[in-house]
Amino acid sequence: MNPWSAGLLGLTFSSPGEFVFRFPPETPLVGGLGLRWYGLLMAIAVLVGLLLTKALAEARHLEKEPGKASERVEILALWLVVSGFLGARLYYVLTHWSEFRDDPLSAFAIWRGGIIIHGGVLAGALALYLYCRATGINGWKYADVLTPGLILGQAIGRWGNFFNSEAYGAPILPDSRWPLRVYIPPQAREPQYSQFEFFHPIFFYESVLNLVLFALLMGMFWRFPKLKDGTWVWTYVVGYSLIRIPYEILRVSAVAYLPGTSIKAAYVASAVGLVLGIGMLIYMYRLRFDPDLEQLAAWLAERAGLELGTAADLVQRAWAIQQKHRRADLLDRVTLAMPHFPSTLAPHLSLGQRELLIRQLFCRLEGR
């Protein structure tokens, strides 16, 4: 059967096989080995995601020195790819422990397949946190520019399931007029569905929806560049959770369950992601914090020994800087505000004391 064929009613997919090419079994040393579509697609996904993330990091000017953000993304990519694959494999092993109970060492045979995206994302997030903690960079800013490349990579990588004839959806009856279907060869069918030939191509559904989420994230990136740090991350978490829940409802092949239960692990992961993501977005964009500027002026006047009118003027200037440069680092905002708080206003305060007061003022303006 052709890899895909179009008819009057829609599109039918049929995998040409899992190998791009394969050495004949009689070939010395490499007989039977070859390049798999899944591996090739994963490599393409990583490369495309890396190039996009580098471009977004530079466009966002995450580092003052040109090219520095791109270099940092390359270092981050190594951390994330390694930790992501390890996490995805560990998650698979834990949710398919019955396959490895008798031979635990086979868990290291990753070339046999078996990775789950939720584990990769969790491990990657941990690696990103540790890297940012070690280097002192703003992790949310880098996480935000990573998310479009991540979901685009997922859209590409999901086609690996097509070539492997795995992770397919519920069977489609012969008389069904549903326009999309994938042919699954007999040896790849679940035993309880062996009498069916065609199934829902959920790999295709998710790939398309991932592209929709990618377009949404990119639209947010260019249309609303001043959104709070972390907005793209939690939008991705919410969006992908919404995509994954119906995907799992249809899925009948290669299903991962919580150990000792009949509950799909992806249901739990998606439900947690959905609740956490929505909760974080609500928390980040809760009722706008409008600080009491008069109260802050009184506080600053007392702490700095200023007249109330002078303190009020300084608070107003700091508030204007806060509104205009809300995405700037705290240190950058302090630098912008310091010319408005010269030593002549408070000769009894040192430069360090004035900087500390301005820093505290900005924190109070943010409601912290």
Across the structure, where does each feature detected by a protein language model lie?
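A feature for loop-to-transmembrane-helix boundaries and adjacent hydrophobic helices
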Residues: M1-T310, C363-G367
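Long, low-complexity, intrinsically disordered cytosolic termini of multi-pass membrane proteins
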Residues: P291-R368
